[in-house]
Amino acid sequence: MKKWKKFLVLALSGVMIAMALTGCGSSSEKSDSDAKVEDVSTRTVYVSPQWVNAAQNGKVKGYKNVKVFEVTYTGKLKDSKSYKKGHVPGAMLIGDTDVEDAVGSQEEPYNLLKPEVIEANLLKHGITKDTKVVLYGEDPSGVARVAYGMIYDGVEDVKVLNGGLDAWKDAGYDTETDVNKAKAATDFGVAVPAHPEYWTSMTDAKAKLQSDSNFKLVSIRSKAEWLGKTSGYSYIDRAGEPEGAVWGKGADSAADVNGYMKDGKVVDLKTLQNGLWKDVDFTMDNHLAFYCGTGWRACVPFLICYQEGMDNISVYDGGWYEWQMYGDNPVQVGDPDSDNCQHTTVSQLPTDKAAKN
């Protein structure tokens, strides 16, 4: 009899614990589903973890089939330690090399791939122009690069989990280690690139600097890069900026966009206008062609402006890396507003300005 009573007590205890745990789970789910998330438009890029969670759970109208991707450089599992360690549930892998070349030659200076190649790569990931995409990753500029490439090619609704996986976990959401794979799509749904106006070539940049007073070539580089003290990169020997460029600030090195972020999250345009961009040599009425060294950092301010509905924006994709490959390209070294700025050509630059790793 005592054994039976002991068994009964243990059984009841187990039921109570299970109910308590179930109750906790229900409460969390209810709070997520009832919590108000931000309103978004198709062109909204940066979204909260709460919004992503709600979309994944079918709680956001129009986003029931959202696809989440973690961005790593190659998008291959063997190279993606962060993904293997733990990722947003349901997230698949995609790489920067799905949208840009990895060659680094004069013919392929880390620019976007040909639009047809981007299209083919996106289709392999099940992405068409109508796919609702959410991206995140460890490098905010690398994530922005993929988002920019998708928008350029024609994906109409691309979101970025602002703050990445850290923000996701800080919001109390779980991660998983399951490897999720996409089902390929066959029809992208639009001729590519859908938005060629968002991409500026070196030839176009040179021509517009000469002929279009409304065109501003905006450097998203560190102060040391802007002033020509360093190239910022171990594989670029020359330092300087294209003649006529203006400074958009925002980086402490070639590997960050710190000025465009606060508390690990990308800021909005109003914050930029009231802070970093309060005293710059361009306005929102100019055509703004952002550039950096090889294209990653420039994509962050592009997306910030894009989500505000601006269309007078682009990325000069080749950046300083491509510009300094051509000896006759005009260059400025130093602050162009000062008397100390040197105006020369690439061929006359010293070749000892590579960054020391």
Go through each PLM region and give its residues:
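Bacterial N-terminal signal peptides that target proteins for export
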Residues: M1-A11
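C-terminal motif of bacterial Sec signal peptides marking the signal peptidase cleavage site
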Residues: M19-G23
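Bacterial signal peptide processing site
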Residues: G25-S27
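N-terminal module-boundary/linker segments of secreted carbohydrate-active enzymes
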Residues: S31-T74
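Thiolate-centered catalytic microenvironments shared by cysteine-dependent enzyme domains
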Residues: A35-D39, L112-A207, G293, R297-Y321
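Active-site neighborhoods of enzymes that stabilize oxyanions during catalysis
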Residues: V37-P49, A102, D166-E243, D328-N357
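Helix-loop module immediately N-terminal to the HCX5R catalytic loop
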Residues: A102-K129, K249-L288
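Extracellular low-complexity, Gly/Ser/Thr-rich intrinsically disordered linkers
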Residues: K265-M325, N329
